[in-house]
Amino acid sequence: MPAKNFRRIPDQTDDQGFLIPGYSAWDCQRCGGEVCRYYGQSDVDCPNCGACYNASGQRLRDDWRGNPSAYDDEVGDLEGFETQHSDY
């Protein structure tokens, strides 16, 4: 599901001529707060509630970081999912 109210704020300069970098922003699905992503960032979290989003504003599952396949190349996706949820 795409981000709600997705907007792009372009680069600007302040009154002294310093660059203020632009960013993308959208409304958080969980709390309604503003989520900002600056150029070059990948996944970002909502500063208010911690909801995870990818670079295009798509909401990620809250438990994705607990899956070992996200950071270990030796662990497959299904094996990582089973390991993550083995304590249930």
Swiss-Prot record:
Renumbered residue ranges of the record's region Disordered: 64-88
Domain of life: Viruses
Listed Acidic residues bias regions: 71-80
Protein name in UniProt: Gene 86 protein
Organism: Mycobacterium phage L5
High-level lineage: Viruses, Duplodnaviria, Heunggongvirae, Uroviricota, Caudoviricetes
Record gene name: 86
